Regions:
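Extracytoplasmic copper-binding redox domains, predominantly the cupredoxin/blue-copper superfamily
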Residues: 2-6, 11-164
């Protein structure tokens, strides 16, 4: 025998279920991503010391794991390339670092030992205030091959429609 439920019961049950999902971890769903730290690009051996992917778009609450696939690398935020109120990170050499992104905006990161060789990357966290730190992040000065790598990365982000 099946019991018919009223619209009121259905709505109350649905609201309670949705609330429990939201309260359980702060988000209905989150995604985990991996960024590999590599000595060379498997698709183009001319590209050395890279993060793969080097440009990533995520949602608030998503997690990114920086995986030291090759030795001698780390991942850390670049000063001035972090949204206000966001948490900094600085991974140790040869160690995985996991970062949950709770603040919309642009996050520029690097491998400290290889930054001047152009080992940099950008994570764009979508949300209402995501453009708030764009100009500050773009204005950060870089040296060595990182300068050219950032120019190319910003061009790629622009072409992908990530910068407004």
């Amino acid at each position: 025998m099946t019991r018919k439920i009223s619209k009121r019961e259905f709505m109350a049950t649905s609201a309670a279920f949705t609330s429990s999902l939201l309260l359980s971890n702060g988000a209905v769903a989150s995604t985990k991503y991996e960024i590999l730290m590599l000595n060379k690009d498997p698709n183009n051996s001319k590209n050395k010391m890279i993060f793969s992917p080097h440009l990533l778009k995520v949602q608030v609450g998503d997690e990114v794991s920086f995986i030291p696939t090759d030795k001698g690398h780390n991942s850390e935020i670049i000063k001035g390339m972090l949204p206000a109120g966001a948490e900094k990170w600085r991974g140790k050499i040869n160690k995985q670092v996991d970062v949950v992104f709770d603040t919309p905006g642009f996050y520029g990161y690097q491998c400290k030992p290889h930054a001047n060789m152009g080992m940099i990357g950008l994570i764009v966290v979508e949300g209402d205030s995501m453009l708030d730190n764009l100009e500050e992040a773009r204005s950060v000065k870089h040296r060595g091959k990182a300068k050219k790598a950032w120019q190319a990365l910003w061009d790629e982000a622009d072409a992908a429609g990530l910068t407004g």
